[in-house]
Amino acid sequence: MDDNPTAVKLDQGGNQAPQGRGRRCLPKALGYITGDMKEFANWLKDKPQALQFVDWVLRGISQVVFVSNPISGILILVGLLVQNPWCALNGCVGTVVSTLTALLLSQDRSAITAGLQGYNATLVGILMAIYSDKGNYFWWLLFPVSAMSMTCPVFSSALNSVLSKWDLPVFTLPFNMALSMYLSATGHYNPFFPSTLITPVTSVPNVTWPDLSALQLLKSLPVGVGQIYGCDNPWTGGIFLGAILLSSPLMCLHAAIGSLLGIIAGLSLSAPFEDIYAGLWGFNSSLACIAIGGTFMALTWQTHLLALACALFTAYLGASMSHVMAVVGLPSGTWPFCLATLLFLLLTTKNPNIYKMPISKVTYPEENRIFYLQSRKRTVQGPL
């Protein structure tokens, strides 16, 4: 026979090699833009300072949802522009001013480059614009936004010096402190910077269960994620979920689950449907679910269940704090998320599967789990 089987195999292998290389190149390329984009950060180290600063600002915008990824920051910025360009502008101004202030105060450079000195001011700028009673494009508002953004690195540094003793993050406590201070100092009747009037509930809400809309409930899931940035547009919430997904699929999953649990909590307390549809029950629980479900605790099925419990607890705490703080005319912000999640992180247990990540090692859930498994392996092999 003239046929050479060996030659045929070699020929087939030669034709398949480029396809195999293509399949290998795709995951490698995705590796450069997913996670925390560490390779990109290393590449920027010898580049112009202005380019590095843009990277820090974009990471700061995305750090609100525990993501340190400039591309995710761009996507989130796009989502903010879809929602309201004025809010997006205030958020950017806050992030830039806060990052510059941290540089002037000689704060930890690694925290600045990771965006950890910008994210609180992102929320400060956005929420100050939302609660302003002057409406959009009241340009004088940029002055108090800049002033309050300058306080964020101060609050962060002070809180970190205390919380670091327990190896705890500051979360969005600086944002809550800055926003509460500003709104309580100005109020609804301030002649220069009036804020939206917030009043406690004084009557029984009209909740008619047959009017409950399944479509609106479905929309409220991405809206709950969007409300982390004060956005009530479902498309914006979807963009935010995409930005989180780019960095970490596990974070995206927990963000969606947390928002869903917030909806369930709202329905269980017969909350006004308008509040549930607007995502007001979902954003704190979404943040809590992300934080416990793999970010500040290594992801196991035990910590996954703990994240679900924390999300529900946060939603109910949010309802409680909203009623209490409305008495003094203030929003609850992300106080419920901060307090509930810090409480869960202080949990002590002898279960090795509930592993709290050292703050210095926290990145994103997939990488955190690898660190946890390696640490556990070293612990097992240590005595040998």
Curated annotation (Swiss-Prot):
Regulation: The rate of urea conduction is increased by hypotonic stress.
A GO MF term: urea channel activity
Alphabetical list of PANTHER family matching this protein: UREA TRANSPORTER, UREA TRANSPORTER 1
Name by which UniProt lists this protein: Urea transporter 1
Residues the record marks as carrying a glycan: 206
Organism from which the protein derives: Bos taurus
Family: Belongs to the urea transporter family.
Cellular component, GO, one term: basolateral plasma membrane
Function: Mediates the transport of urea driven by a concentration gradient across the cell membrane. Mediates the transport of urea across the cell membranes of erythrocytes and the renal inner medullary collecting duct which is critical to the urinary concentrating mechanism. Facilitates water transport in erythrocytes.
Chain segments carrying region Disordered: 1-22
Localization in the cell: Cell membrane; Basolateral cell membrane
Site, Important for channel permeability: residue positions: 334
Predominant place of localization: membrane
InterPro entries in alphabetical order: Ammonium/urea_transptr, Urea_transporter
Subunit structure as annotated in this protein's UniProt entry: Homotrimer; each subunit contains a pore through which urea permeates. Identified in a complex with STOM.
Domain of life: Eukaryota
Protein keywords: Cell membrane, Glycoprotein, Membrane, Transmembrane, Transmembrane helix, Transport
GO biological process, one term: urea transmembrane transport
Pfam (any one): UT
Catalytic activity annotation: urea(in) = urea(out)
Entry's transmembrane regions: 61-81, 85-105, 111-131, 138-158, 237-257, 279-299, 305-325, 327-347
Membrane topology label: Multi-pass membrane protein
